[in-house]
A protein has these predicted regions:
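Active-site microenvironment for binding and transforming phosphate-containing groups
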Residues: 1-270
């Protein structure tokens, strides 16, 4: 199995075998302290559960990953294809310090000990690791970001900033809404076809007047188009909307919910 489920002190999370050499994880809703409707491991700032519970949830999740939550760098997602190059000065932004950036759906860095953190409650998340140049990326890739090519653009940004070669990169695509549940109107397939071309049709099923879209499959196609090798890409295959016991799903729950995170960090002291 390319993805592993872990449980410790009530926390449940997933990791990808392809990223075993770096601290990383995909959270679930299990193991935190937030009350309903954010029960219980909500990691979304600014919700009704309050900052104290949010910080405790981060402390718990980052502890099982061996990471320091006080150095986490959080995205500021608005379904864009914008990428931020993270430096040591960004440590703690979004959690302990205000973010001085907006409209950022992907983060990259080569600084050890800076956990890059992106959010999801159905959207795709992609974690990237360059073992040659010791660089990482974290991407929020919902359908708008997917259609805008954020995954391919993040790979290119890592190349420009750190010399990362696509063939060296390792990638893990976390739990997201699956084609079983991601039912859309025609605008989503049209946007995907405009971006990716005919290959899109393999990831879209027509059901009457509606379309079912394989978001993870399309994000994987962007990775392949960017030059990643198929054997260096792992996909969770887990649908967030099918598992309300484990995940929050915007499609199933609306706005009154928490969010999961995908986080990756470079080891310190190497």
């Amino acid at each position: 199995m390319p993805f592993q489920q872990h449980e410790q002190t009530g926390l449940v999370w997933f990791t990808a075998d392809v990223l075993n050499d770096v601290p990383h994880g995909f959270s679930t809703r299990k193991g935190g302290v937030s009350p309903a409707p954010w029960d219980s491991l909500n990691l979304r700032p600014g919700q009704g559960d309050g900052p104290e519970k949010l910080l405790e949830n981060y402390r718990r999740f980052f502890a099982v990953l061996g990471l320091d939550e006080t150095r986490a760098v959080l995205s500021q997602q608005t379904h864009t294809a914008n990428i931020r190059t993270v430096t040591a000065e960004d440590a703690g932004k979004g959690l302990l310090r205000p973010r001085d950036y907006t409209d950022v759906d992907a983060l990259i860095t080569n600084v050890p000990g800076l956990p890059l953190t992106v959010f999801s409650a159905d959207c795709g998340t992609v974690l990237l690791y360059d073992p040659v140049h010791q660089a990482i990326g974290a991407v929020h890739a919902g359908w708008r970001g997917c259609a805008a090519g954020i995954v391919e653009k993040t790979v290119a940004a890592m190349g420009a900033a750190y010399g990362s070669r696509p063939a060296d990169l390792l990638a893990a695509l976390g739990p997201c809404i699956g084609p079983c549940c991601f039912e859309t109107d025609g605008d989503v397939p049209e946007a995907m076809r405009a971006a990716l071309g005919a290959i899109t049709n393999a990831y879209i099923t027509v059901k009457g007047p509606k379309f079912h879209v394989d978001l993870a499959g399309l994000n994987r196609q962007w990775l392949l188009r960017a030059g990643l090798l198929p054997e260096r890409i792992e996909v969770s295959g887990i649908c967030t909307a099918c598992r309300p016991d484990l995940f929050w799903s915007h499609r199933k729950m609306g706005d009154q919910r928490g969010v999961q995170v995908a986080v990756i960090s470079l080891k310190e002291g190497l």
